[in-house]
Amino acid sequence: MRIAILGGTYNPIHIGHIFLAKEIEFLLNIDKVIFIPTCNPAHKLISEDVTVQNRIDMLKLALENENKILIDDCDIINGGITYTVDTISCVKKKYKNDKLFLVIGDDLFQNFDSWKDPQSIVSSVDLVVAHRIYKERLKSSFKHIYIDNKIIPISSSEIRNRIANGLPVSYLLPCSVLKYIKDNNLYVKKVNICERI
């Protein structure tokens, strides 16, 4: 099988993530796409207001009707700081005989040389770069494949900010995820009592 790996915080998962998974399926003739939520990513902080379980629940809701998309919680189970090279090692043990593709956005690719053991990553899997910010292709000495995907200008941080400021997000998220966010009061601004006086 041809399997694409999409790692991320998914805080929250949004239609841009799902659209990219569908694009990858089509452009690379992928049999399965695996979403891997990170535990504690090395390159960003996750607010303690949203739990790992919240993020996994939202992934499950968003992807419940997608038969070619799976969720793997290997990074969550391993705990600690998440490094992609370790994630790849874990996934390779499960899918020994399959061809693996690691998909990252060009925003991450521009600093790929600063990742932990990048050479080991590109030796283990095919590195796929998706357009996220830049329309042009970035150059790198690391072996990689660029896909000509459509850029969907949505980010999880933008969604969190919009929710915190009471702005609409219904067109950016699957309905089930939006309902979960509302039901669990996620991403809302915490108002200090002193600010009300």
Curated annotation (Swiss-Prot):
GO biological process, one term: NAD biosynthetic process
EC number(s) reported in the record: 2.7.7.18
Pathway(s) annotated for this protein in UniProt: Cofactor biosynthesis; NAD(+) biosynthesis; deamido-NAD(+) from nicotinate D-ribonucleotide: step 1/1
GO MF annotations, alphabetized: ATP binding; nicotinate-nucleotide adenylyltransferase activity
Class of this enzyme: transferase
Keywords: ATP-binding, NAD, Nucleotide-binding, Nucleotidyltransferase, Pyridine nucleotide biosynthesis, Transferase
Protein family according to the UniProt entry: Belongs to the NadD family.
Function as written in the Swiss-Prot or TrEMBL entry: Catalyzes the reversible adenylation of nicotinate mononucleotide (NaMN) to nicotinic acid adenine dinucleotide (NaAD).
Official protein name in the record: Probable nicotinate-nucleotide adenylyltransferase
Organism: Borrelia garinii subsp. bavariensis (strain ATCC BAA-2496 / DSM 23469 / PBi)
Gene name linked to the record: nadD
